Curated annotation (Swiss-Prot):
Residues 673-687 have a biased composition (Basic and acidic residues). InterPro entries: Palmitoyltrfase_DHHC, PFA4/ZDH16/20/ERF2-like. The chain crosses the membrane at residues 16-36, 41-61, 222-242, 277-297. Residues 174-224 form the DHHC domain. This is Probable protein S-acyltransferase 19. Residues 103-124, 479-488, 598-626 have a biased composition (Polar residues). It comes from Arabidopsis thaliana.
Length: 718
């Protein structure tokens, strides 16, 4: 159950003890301490000093316990609970809507055309929710009772520097898998409160609440005032005990006059002595804790960072520093060693994991390191699951770290900060979220991109076209069948949608094909451009034109398996040109699969700057149209070259063997399309034949190792 504050039931036993002791000591002071100091004047002075101090302790304790230190990313959960199921969505609902939106965009391009008018709908929704929460807060401020309660529950004020630092932390936000929400960089999930705490310091059992950014200053003030309160209590108690044993007759008379005949000198001395002893016993640990936090503030670290650093020092080998990096061993994706060990942490921290087949599903356990495995390779005969079960059965619980101001004084704050950073990096609860903002931007661009595809499908038998896109697109079908929309399919889905983005404007299709660093195998660009351009000036398209658009669009979809993602370049409003980056295929250990990374952008930008220059003959084969429809004729002096031969196609291909990346090169495939005439029976027949080949024919495994072929990036081949 998610706890909102420390007053929420069930109460911790330490919290009950703290409240009980405060009440007993306060009553004892007014009944047994102040009246017996000696004289009315001293009594009034001590009551005047003690009363405001005790009141401040009470207010600060109530305030520090009542403040909700949760991260702002999960505050919507509490706001919705307060409104009794109102219309404020939780972070989980927003995340679910985000995933459902991505799945709808992936499966139905026509849906995206309706949402293209609001490309940042998910972002606007979250902003709208935050505005509704702020509006509810503003309305509650006009309630007089809310103003009185605000003294106890309103969070601590922060300086401008801390606010700027807080804004900077949003750039490196994390995603909590337990809260299912985006949290700030220095937040941590408290398992006692079951929520992420903003700038987590520690969970105080005496308050039954977490101490974080929102109530840390109140916590420090509470300790300081409590020390003063205990000092007054203990000092006055010692003075009264001295009078009991020094002025016995006078004290007996005062006890009878003020408390009645039921109290004698012995019981009175016992009560005063116990209360004084309790005050002194509480004074020393509280003073050490206050001094400890003063050192933390001076060093600029938190209690959590201190605990992590001390635990790392206790578990580190003798003579090793806590900031030493364990060597990060690189593993082959096809090697057997990946079944036992992984260096999946972003900072090179090894943590326990178990690879599944295929190596995309990875299960890790927070703050655990494999004790039975060395950083070297292990044989494939080792069963990590069996070893893990045996280890969990004999697992020794972590020893609690004692709060020591002396150890903190000798601790290097930089080492503590690095140790805490490693702990966050190796956590299975908090994950980095850098790519999440990028995914939101990409999703916005995809909405506008797919809407064009939807409009084309409406004009040219949209039902058939959308069905062909889903059937002939191996990338989208693979993502839809293998990954969840929120994790594994982002890179692949990005490739598919950006390939369709070249159809966003008919006048840009020709430019995109010309600027592509990879060769084009057909002349779909001109025919699609001409068909789209002539649509506004002619009657509706006939059946032959529909068939031509379907075939050319299928060929465009087939090309995206061999093309990189398009890069949008700054351009004037009249003409938006799209550039293409060359990519390299590398193995991502954290994702457990191959990903495409940009190699360079200089070549596409160079081609973009020289697009008005004469096009070489090697590229004319990609842009010439043997059958232009509605396109103005070109001069014979423009250097029209015949289509390249089969040998020239093979020389320009990225890879020469069969590839696992969606069909591989289109070479040595027999021409079986006899229904088309001679003008289109060259490369178009080969492209059409590739689309009709089964998946097993395009993705062939090696007969000896039963593995799919692996290829190195182009930059490494000579």
């Amino acid at each position: 159950m998610v706890r909102k504050h420390g007053w929420q039931l069930p109460a911790h036993k330490f919290q009950v003890v703290a409240i009980t002791v405060f009440c007993l000591l306060s009553v004892a002071y007014y009944a047994f301490f102040a009246p017996f100091v000696g004289g009315r004047i001293w009594e009034y002075i001590l009551l005047g000093v003690y009363s405001p101090v005790a009141l401040i302790v009470f207010v600060l304790y109530v305030r520090c316990t009542a403040i909700n230190p949760a991260d702002p990313g999960i505050m919507s959960k509490f706001e919705r609970g307060a409104s009794r199921g109102g219309d404020l969505p939780t972070a989980k609902d927003i995340s679910r809507k985000f995933d459902e939106t991505g799945s709808h965009l992936q499966s139905s391009p026509s849906v995206a055309s309706r949402t293209s008018t609001l490309p940042n709908s998910s972002v606007k929704g979250s902003v709208g929710d935050a505005q509704r929460v702020e509006a509810a807060k503003r309305k509650s401020c006009f309630n007089p009772l809310a103003i009185c309660c605000g003294v106890f529950v309103y969070e601590d004020c922060r300086s401008k520097e801390e606010t700027d630092e807080q804004q900077g932390d949003r750039e490196e936000a994390l995603f909590c898998t337990l809260c299912n929400a985006e949290v700030r960089k220095f937040s941590k999930h408290c398992r006692s409160c079951d929520k992420c705490v903003d700038c987590f310091d520690h969970h105080c059992r005496w308050l039954n609440n977490c101490v974080g950014r929102k109530n840390y200053m109140t916590f420090i003030s509470l300790m300081a005032v409590s020390l003063l309160w205990l000092l007054i209590e203990a000092g006055v108690g010692i003075a009264v005990i001295v009078r009991v044993f020094v002025n016995k007759k006078d004290m007996e008379t005062e006890i009878v006059n003020r408390l009645g005949n039921g109290f004698s000198r012995a019981p009175f001395a016992t009560v005063v002595g116990l209360c004084t002893a309790v005050s002194m016993l509480a004074l020393f640990p509280l003073g050490e804790l206050f001094f400890f936090h003063m050192l933390l503030i001076k060093k600029g670290i938190t209690t959590y960072e201190y605990v992590v650093a001390m635990r790392a020092m206790s578990e580190a080998p003798a003579g090793a520093s806590i900031d030493e990096e364990i060597p990060n061993v690189l593993y082959s994706p096809s090697g057997s060693a990946t079944t036992g060990f992984s260096g999946g942490s972003s900072l090179g921290l090894p943590y326990k994991g178990a690879w599944c087949t295929p190596p995309r599903v990875f299960v890790d356990y927070q703050d655990e390191v494999i004790p039975h495995l060395d950083p070297r390779m292990v044989p494939s005969t080792v069963d990590p699951d069996a070893a893990e079960t045996a280890e969990r059965g004999n697992k020794i619980p972590k020893r609690p770290v004692k709060i020591s101001a002396w150890k903190l004084a000798k601790l290097n704050s930089n080492e503590a900060t690095r140790a805490a950073a490693r702990a966050r990096a190796s956590s299975s609860v908090l994950r980095p979220i850098e790519n999440r903002h990028l995914h939101d931007d990409e999703l916005s661009s995809r909405s506008g991109t797919i809407s064009v595809v939807s409009s084309v499908s409406t004009e040219a038998n949209g039902a058939t076209l959308s069905r062909e896109i889903r059937n002939n697109d191996p990338m989208l079908s693979h993502c839809r069948n293998s990954y969840a929309p929120s994790q594994g399919s982002r890179d692949e889905y990005d490739t598919g949608t950006h390939s369709m983005s070249s159809l966003s404007s008919p006048s840009h299709v020709h430019e995109t094909v010309t600027l592509s660093p990879l060769p084009q195998h057909h002349t779909a660009g001109h025919r699609f451009t001409a068909a789209a351009a002539s649509n506004s000036s002619r009657p509706p398209l006939n059946q032959a034109t529909n068939h031509m658009i379907h075939s050319t669009f299928d060929e465009k979809i087939m090309q995206k398996g061999n093309h990189a993602d398009p890069l949008l370049l700054p351009a004037p409003a009249a003409s938006l040109l799209r550039d293409v980056r060359r990519t390299s295929v590398v193995w991502d250990q954290e994702a457990g699969r191959y990903i495409s990374v940009p190699a360079t952008t200089s070549e596409p930008r160079t081609r973009f700057s020289s697009q008005n220059q004469p096009i070489p003959s090697s590229h004319m084969g990609n842009t010439q149209n043997p059958r232009p429809v509605g396109h103005p004729p070109q001069d014979s002096s423009s250097g029209r070259a015949p289509p390249p031969t089969q040998q020239q196609q093979g020389e320009r291909l990225m890879y020469t063997g069969e590839s696992i990346f969606f069909g591989g090169p289109l070479v040595n495939i027999p021409n079986r399309d006899g229904l088309r005439h001679d003008g289109d029976s060259g490369r178009e027949g080969q492209d059409r034949m590739t689309l009709t080949l089964p998946r097993e024919a395009r993705f062939k495994r090696d007969t000896t190792s039963n593995q799919l072929p692996v290829f190195a990036p182009v930059g490494t081949r000579k």
